[in-house]
Design a protein with these regions (language model features):
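Non-catalytic cell-wall polysaccharide-engagement segments
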Residues: 1-11, 19-27, 38-40, 68, ...
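Secreted/periplasmic proteins that engage bacterial cell-wall peptidoglycan
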Residues: 10, 34, 38-72
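A generic alpha-helix surface/boundary motif
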Residues: 30-31
């Protein structure tokens, strides 16, 4: 019991520390994030939370690419799945990825109309990440068993 409590609390502290340090880098993108969020009816904090989780607001990127050169940009779009638009840190890139997020959320809402909004949002975030939406049963986090990705994005969005 103590070990899992410690791990959970340590994880929360780590997310808080990284989110706080990412806020400084995210300020550079505040205006494009807010513009995209307004146009797509998204909470700008959700976009910022994904940017923080995926690329640490650009800190983890090499000229816009992840280490394996498979994902691109602040929101880490896979080059196999999508045509890339704009520079890695541009409003165009943020708009492209945020549009994919909105489509993912709407797909989950259509497939699971009885889910709560929180469940649909979590499923949409997961679908954005995993590029899949084949959920038959809702669990705490359909992304993975330890709830890490979706919970991390949501917690980062709260900072």
């Amino acid at each position: 019991v103590c070990k899992s409590t410690f791990s959970y609390n340590a994880g929360l502290a780590m997310i808080r520390r990284t989110a706080e340090s990412d806020i400084v880098r995210l300020r550079k993108y505040e205006i494009p994030i807010k513009r995209v969020a307004r146009n797509l009816c998204l909470d700008p904090a959700l976009i910022a939370g994904i940017i923080s989780q995926e690329s640490r607001a650009g800190l983890l990127l090499d000229n816009g690419w992840d280490q394996g050169r498979q994902k691109y940009g602040l929101m880490q779009i896979g080059r196999q799945q999508h045509q890339l638009f704009g520079m890695w840190d541009s409003e165009e890139h943020i708009n492209q990825c945020s549009t994919i997020l909105v489509l993912a959320i709407n797909e989950v809402r259509a497939r699971h109309p009885t889910w709560t909004w929180d469940q649909q949002l979590r499923g949409g975030i997961c679908t954005y990440r995993a590029k899949m939406g084949n959920y038959q049963v809702y669990e705490e986090d359909p992304c993975d068993r330890d709830d890490y990705y979706v919970n991390s994005v949501i917690r980062r969005a709260q900072y």
